[in-house]
Amino acid sequence: MGRKVLVGLLVLVALGTIAISQRHKILIPLITTGAQIPQLVDASPVPGGQPFGDENHFSIVQLDEKTFAIAEPYSWARNVNYLILGDRRALLFDAGVGHYDIRPVVESLTDLPVTFMPSHFHYDHTGQGNWTKIAIVDLPHIRERADGNLLQPTWGEHLGDGEGIELPTWDVT
């Protein structure tokens, strides 16, 4: 009897450990449909924001002479992305979910070549990552995973599967 209880407890501990370590792979498919999350009906107003585009998905706020906040007030994530203008290049820090292309917004604000840099690899910050120049923080554990200049975020880093967004492979410069 005691041995059965011990084996049962060990099995429960093993299952609990697996469930905790794989929780996102278990929960996301259970709570999502794999379809795009609809836009919000009511936007969060962006103080001083100028709507952009036919659907006003983006709202632009100029923070200073060379810095723009590009908000997505109708996105469930309500992201704020930043465009920072330099003398020779511009840096786009985050690019939203990517259901609406942020590129026309960026092109309306600068003629400079743009380097995209995500704050992290979740899909709601990478804009689906199809940029000519992509910069990633150069950390040893990320460099080890790269195949030359090609880098693919892991499923757990990206989490786009819940909205049917496939893992990207980025050509990092």
Task: Locate each region found by the language model.
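Short Pro/Gly-enriched beta-strand edge/turn motifs at strand-loop
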Residues: 41, 62-68, 165-172
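N-terminal helix-forming leader/targeting segments
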Residues: 49-51
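Conserved beta-strand hairpin/beta-sheet module of binuclear metal-dependent hydrolase folds
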Residues: 54-108
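Ser/Thr/Pro/Gly-rich low-complexity linker/stalk segments immediately outside membranes or between
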Residues: 24-38
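Positively charged n-region of N-terminal signal peptides that target proteins for export
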Residues: 1-4
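Hydrophobic membrane-insertion alpha-helices, especially the h-region
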Residues: 6-19
